[in-house]
């Protein structure tokens, strides 16, 4: 009976145990009195209750399987017909070992072959990288104000130059081909974004006031002494700083690209011919005439012009670096002498004390994108404030263009008033507080609440101070195969700056006009204390190179934008960003569409030639005083969406060009 009871218990085990006994017939027979290893089971359950469940934990399953008593005879096996157990006389370990041995031999051969192949491919790739011809597998794009400089930027990229190398060469080229807009005697700002690292830096090389410059001196004599308008040029220091940070080719080689343009000659652009024709004879020095009007008359578009003087200067800078410009050499002495001869107060010490600034751009999130722009004394915060205000309106394709234009006009009135309160934060700590307010979404909502949807405000919502910026500026926009984006805007302020030119051919800027002082303008606008004249200070600036990237992640739309036209450039950038990011228009259409700009001093709403009479009538019905002009500003751009890149110039510019590397 005891034997029958035991058999009955074993049959019950075979019938109700969840164990598949075909999987344990090769296990060795265990002594019946072997104690159960209960402690390890408890430890595993303590670690993870779910994995400790015998139905789910493979370790627990195997341990419980070892506790089952296996039949000891064939008769016992036969007495359990319902059991799935089968007797085996093979040595389970020897059979398994032989089978594993075979499998291991085959696996070893396969793994060895794969490793050998992979090693060979890796060695070949490394040798190709180090000894093969260099190759570029991605696209690139260049946009500048002159076709010759755009092609030069492409040339630098094709010779394995970095995006910043291309930007430096193209910017120096514009100082040669478009001397009315930019040059070695001016300054600017460059915004660089590294897509792979998702990092951005801004190089600020805006001109600074000479140490001996005083407000009362400017107020009394600025119209008769052009030398007073000359600030310490930052162009050479800024471009060299950018190259030190991001350059790939040697500095001398980058400058040699631009020097070749000056030496070999270039075709006079339509814009340069127009600017020279508009220069009044009394404003031209004899040296200026010899340089730009060798025949005694303004050159025609397309005529060939050589600048061997600038080629020589660039050769010197390529060999000696910025020290040749700032450290008291011949170039420094010439610039100081030229400015002082025309009533200026700039000194050699001002040049030696100058430094370019490397800082972070200001940023704001707009429609799922991060907009990056220069901080004060530049007006990037006002640009972001305009976008923050517009973001709260229901601007979709279903909203009429006329209604959208009204909202844009009222928003820009606020943004430009905010811009007039900015200046150099090094000299006024309240500017940082003003900047923070401009970047605030809460503040934007408050300002938006003061905009009437159907009627123009009869007077500015905020106090407006004197607004006057450089009307001419040169733009360079690069999206390189190295996954860098570069946006740069530079200027001499007025066309040809101060009109003063050194014996070496360097035109000097007139950037001190961007400061504010009493009774400077004909309409007697209130001067801005934040932008008052002080030694070493940098004046308010509307140079706004702007980069847009996805707010999250690396995939999506990137933009590089620039504009000229001073305050009108801020208005233009705002409307282009609105068209691309809110209304989902392509970049070409966004740049071509008509733009407006509220002139706060005259209380006129200026619109360009692209506006229809119906649109003008609608705006006038809303209370706007509309003035139609030919062109407000040029806004160029480049766009990258994933791996597709396009370069687009503003169609209003007769000379600008965009080119894409395929």
UniProtKB/Swiss-Prot annotation:
Reactions catalysed, semicolon-separated, are: an N-terminal (5-L-glutamyl)-[peptide] + an alpha-amino acid = 5-L-glutamyl amino acid + an N-terminal L-alpha-aminoacyl-[peptide]; glutathione + H2O = L-cysteinylglycine + L-glutamate; an S-substituted glutathione + H2O = an S-substituted L-cysteinylglycine + L-glutamate
| Chief subcellular location | membrane
Note down the stretches annotated as region Disordered.
Answer: 26-90
Q: Where is the composition biased (Low complexity)?
A: 72-83
Enzyme Commission code(s) on record: 3.4.19.13, 2.3.2.2
Q: How does it sit in the membrane?
A: Single-pass type II membrane protein
Named in its record, the pathway it takes part in is: Sulfur metabolism; glutathione metabolism
| Ranges in the topological domain labelled Cytoplasmic | 1-106
Pfam families registered for this protein in UniProt: G_glu_transpept
Q: Which residues lie on this side of the membrane: Extracellular?
A: 128-662
Q: Record keywords: Membrane included?
A: yes
Q: Could you give the subunit structure recorded for this chain?
A: Heterodimer composed of the light and heavy chains. The active site is located in the light chain.
Name the family. Belongs to the gamma-glutamyltransferase family.
Q: What is this protein called?
A: Glutathione hydrolase 7
Write down the species. Homo sapiens (Human)
Lineage at the top is:
Eukaryota, Metazoa, Chordata, Craniata, Vertebrata
Q: What is the gene called?
A: GGT7
């Amino acid at each position: 009976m005891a034997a029958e009871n035991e058999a009955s218990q074993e049959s019950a085990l075979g019938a109700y145990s969840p164990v598949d006994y075909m999987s344990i017939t090769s296990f060795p027979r265990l002594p019946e009195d072997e104690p159960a290893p209960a402690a390890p089971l408890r430890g595993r359950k303590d670690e993870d209750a779910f994995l400790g469940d015998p139905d789910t934990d493979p370790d627990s399953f195997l341990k419980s399987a070892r506790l089952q008593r296996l039949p000891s005879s064939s008769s016992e096996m036969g007495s359990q017909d319902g059991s799935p157990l089968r007797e085996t006389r093979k040595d389970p370990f020897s059979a398994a070992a032989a089978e594993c041995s075979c499998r291991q031999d085959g696996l070893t051969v396969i793994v060895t072959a794969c490793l050998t192949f992979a090693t060979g491919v890796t060695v070949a790739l490394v040798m190709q990288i180090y000894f093969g011809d260099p190759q570029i597998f991605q696209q690139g794009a260049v946009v500048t104000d002159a076709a010759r400089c755009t092609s030069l930027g492409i040339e630098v990229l094709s010779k394995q130059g970095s995006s910043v190398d291309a930007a430096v060469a193209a910017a120096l080229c514009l100082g040669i081909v478009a001397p009315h807009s930019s040059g070695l005697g001016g300054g600017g700002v460059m915004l660089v974004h590294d897509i792979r690292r998702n990092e951005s830096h801004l190089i600020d090389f805006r001109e600074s006031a000479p140490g001996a410059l005083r407000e009362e001196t400017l107020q009394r004599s600025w119209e008769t002494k052009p030398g007073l308008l000359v600030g310490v040029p930052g162009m050479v220091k800024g471009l060299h700083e950018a190259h030190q940070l991001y350059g790939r080719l040697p500095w001398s080689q980058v400058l040699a690209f631009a020097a070749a343009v000056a030496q070999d000659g270039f075709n006079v652009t339509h814009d340069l011919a127009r600017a020279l024709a508009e220069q009044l004879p009394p404003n031209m020095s004899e040296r200026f005439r010899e340089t730009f009007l060798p025949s005694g008359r303004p050159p025609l578009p397309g005529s060939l012009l050589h600048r061997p003087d600038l080629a020589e200067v660039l050769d010197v800078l390529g060999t000696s670096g910025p020290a040749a410009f700032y450290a008291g050499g011949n170039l420094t002495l010439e610039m100081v002498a030229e400015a002082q001869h025309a009533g200026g107060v700039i000194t050699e010490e001002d040049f030696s004390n100058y430094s370019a600034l490397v800082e972070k751009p200001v940023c704001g999130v707009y429609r799922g994108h991060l907009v990056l722009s220069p901080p004060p004394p530049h007006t990037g915060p006002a640009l972001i404030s305009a976008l923050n205000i517009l973001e709260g309106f229901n601007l979709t394709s279903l909203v009429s263009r006329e209604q959208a234009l009204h909202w844009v006009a009222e928003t820009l009135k606020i943004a430009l008033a905010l811009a007039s309160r900015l200046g150099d934060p090094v000299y006024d700590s309240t500017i940082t507080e003003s900047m923070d307010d401009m970047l605030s979404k809460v503040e934007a909502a408050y300002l938006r609440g003061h905009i009437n949807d159907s009627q123009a405000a009869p007077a500015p919502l905020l106090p407006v101070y004197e607004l006057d910026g450089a009307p001419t500026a040169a733009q360079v926009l690069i999206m390189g195969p190295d996954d860098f984006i570069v946006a740069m805007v530079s200027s001499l302020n007025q066309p040809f700056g101060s009109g003063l030119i050194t014996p070496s051919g360097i035109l000097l800027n007139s950037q001190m006009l961007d400061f504010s002082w009493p009774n400077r303008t004909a309409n007697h606008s209130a001067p801005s204390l934040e932008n008052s004249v002080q030694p070493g200070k940098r004046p308010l600036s509307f140079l706004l190179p702007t980069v847009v990237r996805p707010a999250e992640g690396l995939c999506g739309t990137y933009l590089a934008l620039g504009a000229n036209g001073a305050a009108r450039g801020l208005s233009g950038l705002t409307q282009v960003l609105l068209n691309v990011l809110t209304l989902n228009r392509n970049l070409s259409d966004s740049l071509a569409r008509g733009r407006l700009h509220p002139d706060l001093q005259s209380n006129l709403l200026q619109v360009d030639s692209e506006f229809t009479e119906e649109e003008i009538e609608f705006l006038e019905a809303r209370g706007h005083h509309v003035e139609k002009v030919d062109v407000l500003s040029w806004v160029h751009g480049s766009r990258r969406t994933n791996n597709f890149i396009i370069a687009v110039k503003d169609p209003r510019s007769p000379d600008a060009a965009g080119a894409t590397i395929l």
